[in-house]
């Protein structure tokens, strides 16, 4: 099951992908209303939204997890196999960085998660797979582990064949997609794949 989460970052014009259920975290409810969408679940402490929507699951402001993390937990409890998190970039830098790190949290729970904001898609990847891109647009791979060994790629202007992407270095910044689907094979480590669609 694919679940969409609306977070409370910057509200950018974004193409929504098909989903089975929608969870709104705090201010994400405002974005759902702006898009004339009815969420299946609403949760959070609502410090950003400023009021408590009807039928919302309400949590205290003094808690040890963010509203977006709560939404991921909820999605997993509902049986999600994939999660797309919208509107979680922009705004406060600390929230933005933690939202990106929540991709690892979802992965640890056995769920594939992506952040989608405007024309930007961020995914935490390892192993091998094919990914949506846009011909002519930038693709970057940011090392998430200390080192990632990329053994093969297809669909990139600058092939990533048998290279080591090291955290803190910029070797894999600003590649270019040569087609609308790219393939990346990683022998070890993890990278944040950032595609601009």
Residue ranges and their predicted role:
Residues 1-53:
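N-terminal beta-strand-loop-alpha-helix module at the start
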Residues 104-135:
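A contiguous pocket-lining binding segment that forms or flanks enzyme active sites
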Residues 125-197:
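Long, charged alpha-helical interface segments
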Residues 57-78:
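Short phosphate-binding loop-to-helix
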Residues 58-61, 111-114, 139-140, 148:
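A glycine-rich helix N-cap at a beta->alpha junction
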Residues 94-104:
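Short Gly/Thr/Asp-enriched flexible loops that form oxyanion-binding sites at enzyme active sites
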